[in-house]
Amino acid sequence: MVIEDISSILRQEAEAVLNIPVVAEYNEAVTLIVEYVHNRNGKLITSGMGKAGQIASNLATTFSSTGTPAFFLHPSEAQHGDLGIVRDNDIMLLISNSGKTRELIELTRLTLGLAPDMKF
């Protein structure tokens, strides 16, 4: 791979980010993250399965590296003990292609059992 190829890939990725549609749901998500993480001293918890899980993991890493407390919680691991890290002032960002991912539905149910006011 040469410099021109790398530059082209980076330009394409930057353009993709710039073209993210800013709709009401996006604005609401950003507002919730600011409220819970920065105003309430919570954490941003991301989760997803498969490729969506890789995206969620990358998001958590990016947020963490820019000063926003965040981590990736694998849905299956959450069911076997890792859910104990979740607190009431945290917020979850769940990534799913279909919106019907079985493991994320179960993660939501289990989380609400521990933190009934959790925002997703």
Predicted regions span which residues?
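An N-terminal, well-structured beta->alpha segment
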Residues: 1-42
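Glycine-rich phosphate-binding loops that contact phosphosugars or nucleotide phosphates
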Residues: 34-38, 43-120
